[in-house]
From Swiss-Prot:
Gene Ontology biological-process annotations: amino acid transport
Family designation: Belongs to the amino acid-polyamine-organocation (APC) superfamily. Basic amino acid/polyamine antiporter (APA) (TC 2.A.3.2) family.
Membrane disposition: Multi-pass membrane protein
One example GO MF annotation: antiporter activity
UniProt main location, coarse: membrane
Identification of the protein by name: Arginine/agmatine antiporter
Cross-referenced Pfam families: AA_permease_2
């Protein structure tokens, strides 16, 4: 029997939700940002890349903010926006892809956590895929599972502490690099077009921008954190505030971390530092204590992000099951109103994926790249739904956001989402379609048993399922004949 709980469960305010957004966006990768950005670009190109990415992601962030205000009834937005705008099967497919993406993403956090521990306990956890690392990661999967089972509010409080814990080392890094900043060093080869014995030619501005934007476009995955948890928010306005606050805060930190080191070290020096490069930079600038601080920060960051995504990832199948597009069993809650079955199934799948890490690192890395692409259609569907709803007579034009503003925001958000999908790569997109097609049997099962059985399998749904199945078969053919290679 599905429990409705005795309380509403709406207990997450703007601060808790903003912590969710920041924690889900700022993971372990940020501690490698100085080297990642400097690897193939000068500081001028890096600044432009962040401006372009920031503008594009602003429209996606604002899409989520507007939708949370004009359609507060659509909680768990990523899934519900797609379902409301384009029907049950599209909603299911977006939710299914997002769920798979975050399952593998969480296992990625397990690998990064163990690899970060290797700094303190070498060589037992090297690479995050040794036997001790797999055992340690497996234990943490279930620790986080039981933390979230105790209640979303308690887990979000722990997450706020973790978010503060990982921001402190980053702020220290920013303060130190700002204090030691020298304009003369910063201006040296600003556009990356000077060749010296130590400084190779970095290429055209276009090539520099492309290489850096492949880094920046992934930096904002997680911006939807507050929207996904909106069913547990105190108010719709808290969701919008948290999304914009999280976006602005993260963008500021990203820019400062990427640019300030160029005032102390030259591009070729930054490009040659081993990751996590924030640790290497501080080791050069202030000594060993700086390196240790950054590695501690990395460990806290990964654990905090992992907890955030554990809360988020279980919410999608739980919400979809309540609407009849996932098997009904996923809607079962415990006494703390946590999505019990959804959490256990998600954690079990993560556990299986941990074994894949141990037996085949190459296969794991490929799977991580594929599932990373699967989150992007959710952004496009949300932006497209905003455009569609802005044309609807039910749009609240007397509210704070006019229909024209909503339409432009959605259009620009959709355009940027298409760019993200393109930048992700065709081969990974095709593999993602195969994984999306694997969800079809679950959708059919939900349609036969769910509360909305009468509305399932209309001509529109049959057509959509047929298209996805055809594209999946085409992708299998292209890979099997090596027309396209991973």
């Amino acid at each position: 029997m599905i429990s409705n709980g005795s309380k509403s469960g709406k207990n997450l305010g703007a601060i808790a939700l903003a912590g969710m957004v920041i924690s889900s966006m700022i993971g372990g990768g940020i501690f490698s940002l100085p080297q990642n950005m400097a690897a193939s670009a000068g500081v001028g190109a890096i600044i432009l890349a962040w401006i372009l990415t920031g503008v594009g992601m602003f429209f996606i962030a604002n899409t989520f903010k507007i939708l949370s205000l004009v359609r507060p009834d659509l909680t768990t937005g990523i899934y519900m926006y797609s379902r409301e705008g384009f029907g049950p099967y599209i909603g299911f497919t977006i939710g299914w892809g997002y769920w798979l993406c975050q399952i593998f993403g969480n296992v990625g956090y397990a690998v990064m956590t163990m690899d970060a521990l290797n700094y303190f306990f070498p060589p037992y956890f090297q690479g995050g895929n040794t036997l001790p690392a797999i055992l340690g990661g497996s234990i943490l999967i279930w620790v986080f599972n039981f933390i979230v089972l105790k209640g979303i509010r308690q887990a979000s409080f722990i997450n706020i502490i973790g978010t503060v814990g990982k921001l402190v080392p980053l702020i220290v890094f920013i303060i130190i690099t700002a204090f030691l900043f020298k304009l003369a060093i910063f201006k040296t080869d600003f556009w990356g077009d000077t060749v010296t014995k130590t400084q190779p030619l970095l290429g055209s501005m276009t090539s520099q921008l492309k290489s850096t934007m492949l880094v920046t476009l992934w930096a904002f995955i997680g911006i939807e954190g507050a929207v996904v948890m909106s069913a547990r928010a105190k108010s719709p306005s808290a969701v919008g505030k948290a999304t914009i606050l999280g976006f602005t805060g993260c963008l500021t930190v990203y820019i400062l971390l990427s640019i300030l080191p160029f005032g102390s070290l030259f591009q070729h020096q930054l490009a040659g530092i081993a990751n996590p490069s924030t640790a290497g930079v501080l080791d050069i600038l202030v000594g060993k204590w700086g390196e240790i601080l950054m590695n501690v920060g990395l460990l806290i960051a990964v654990l905090s992000s992992w907890l955030s995504w554990t809360m988020i990832v279980a919410e999608i199948p739980y919400s979809a099951a309540k609407n009849g597009t996932f098997p009904e069993i996923f809607a079962i809650e415990n006494a703390h109103r946590s999505p019990k079955v959804s959490l256990y199934v998600t954690s079990a799948l993560m556990q299986i994926a941990m074994l894949l890490v141990y037996f085949s690192t190459d296969a794991w890395n490929t799977m991580l790249s594929i599932t990373g692409v699967m989150v992007l259609p959710a952004y496009f569907a949300s932006a497209a739904f905003l455009v569609k709803f802005s044309k609807n007579k039910k749009y609240p034009n007397k509210g704070p956001i006019k229909a024209f503003t909503a339409k432009i925001t959605g259009l620009l958000g959709a355009v940027y989402s298409i760019w993200l999908i393109y930048a992700g790569g065709l081969k990974y997109l095709l593999m993602a379609i195969i994984l999306l097609a694997l969800g079809i049997p679950f959708y059919i099962d939900a349609g036969k048993k769910g509360r909305n059985a009468k509305t399932f399998f209309a001509k529109k749904e049959v057509t959509e399922i047929t298209i996805i199945a055809f594209l999946a078969l085409l992708a299998i053919f292209l890979f099997s004949t090596e027309k396209i290679r991973l």
